[in-house]
Every structure is written in C-alpha cells, then in structure tokens.
C-alpha cells in the first residue's frame, strides 16, 4: 500500500511507504523544514502542521494519507562584499570571467570577477540548502554516512549553479564565457560538493582528503560553463579547510613580517596566528553560540 502525502503550501503530492519517516520523505523532495540537529529530535525546530497541530517531522511516521503544512526553509542571506584585503596578482588559467565560491556550512556565496584585474562584477548568496540535514558539519557527516550523501551533493551543486546564473545575469555576462571557477569551503563542505564520502572526517585522525590544489573541468558539475576550469583549493586539516587558506591569501597574512591574528567566525570557526615564517591554526564550533542549533530558544540573525 502506498500513502499520499500532500505538502502545503507547495501543493505537491508525494508517495510514501507506510512507516516512512516524514522528514526523510520531505528531504527527498527538497521540501524539508530546517532541522538544525540533523533530525535527531533534539532541537525541536523541524515543526510542521498536521491537522492544525504542530508535529516534529523527524519524529513522525507516515501511516496513511496525510496533509502536511511546511514552513519553507530560509533561502536568502545577506553578506558583506566590501572590505580590506591584500593586492594579489592574478594569472587566470583561461580567458573569460572568473567565478569564486565560498561554500559555508550556513551560507553559500558566489563572486563573479573580471579576469586579469579581479574586479568584482557581481555577487549572489543564499542559505546552504543542506540545512535540513543539520546545522553543523557533524550532523551532515552522519547523514552522509547513513546513505544521504548523494542528496546533499545534488542540493549544493544545484544551488551553486543557480547562484552562478544569478551573478552572471547581474553582470550581463554569458555563463558559457566563464573561464575559471574556484571553490573553497571547510573540508566537509568541499567533499560533499565533490561527491567524496566524508568518512575520513568522522574518525581519528580526521585526515583531510584534499591536500593539494586540483584543477579539472567544470562542465560536468556546471553544464552552463562547458569551457571553464574547476579549481579546488587544498584543506589544511580535517577541520581547517580551504576557506581558511583563502582568508590567509586574501588578507596577505602569508606575506606579513609581524605576527598577525586572523579570525574566521562561522558555523565552523578558525583562528590563524603567525606570519610569513610560521602559522599556527586551530578550529572550533562557533555556530552554537550564534545560531541556536541545539538550544531550546535561539536562532540565526534573521527575520523571525
């Protein structure tokens, strides 16, 4: 027997087997509410309405035809696009505009840059759609190991393609003329983007897989950019990623004579102390202090 789950206000009808978990079903259709704890019943924030009553989607088992009202997960984000940085001489691999992605655990950003000069042409950002698999990297690793990696990979690639399209429209640039696409993120976000199972990040010694810069073809992941090169920046360790490498290069810390402290406050937070001779790096979870993932009352800095 197959059950029909009607999802409002999307107006979608989903087929489910008796005993199927509602949150898992909604995830498969990209209709899931936010689930900061990854669907473990700890945060109480994947609430949906069934028969006018609030129910946690992660704890509801489909047993028959049902109508579910789902509040859409947040998709928009505001980002800072201006700031101070070091002058970096650019040597593009290929002609055409350049796109740079920062895959954050919470926010994903696409910058479109002019080749040669690095002048910012446009920027687009959105909330990472993997949020329904958990607000933190540990939750997403657990869901990937439970068989939901391909779904997370599909979600992030689709969103990055959409953001690239938005940035190109803003700048009046044809996507097929983009020559280089560069991607940074913490190790988990990079591996999920590339479709690499993050099991290495779930066990000691948490060794990174991406230990050197890689250059490949972007067309398989971004069909709209068939001629672009895809550049992935290396990770430093299991929980210090390519985004930190990007911070070091953009700030010029790798060329500083005096000791300098660099702090990246995100869902995954990093600190770098040093100069061009030596750097010491550490990471910690900053998200719980800012986003309320696993506390009873709390949320991101957003409307609500």
Describe each model-derived feature in a short phrase.
Residues 136, 178, 192-246, 290-293:
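Glycine-rich phosphate-binding loop and adjoining helix at the ATP-binding site
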Residues 32-64:
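Local cysteine-cluster metal-coordination motifs and their immediate loop/turn environment
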Residues 98-102, 178-182, 260-264:
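Short glycine-aspartate micro-motif
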Residues 52-101, 108, 179:
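Fe-S ferredoxin-like electron-transfer domains
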Residues 39-42, 61, 101-107, 113-116, ...:
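A short acidic Gly-Thr/Ser loop motif
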Residues 80-96, 230-260:
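Conserved phosphate-binding catalytic cores of ATP/NTP-utilizing and phosphoryl-transfer enzymes
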Residues 129-170, 294-298:
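N-terminal phosphate-binding loop and adjacent alpha-helix
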Residues 110, 118-136, 199-213, 255-304:
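Glycine-rich phosphate-binding loop of actin/hexokinase-like ATP-binding domains
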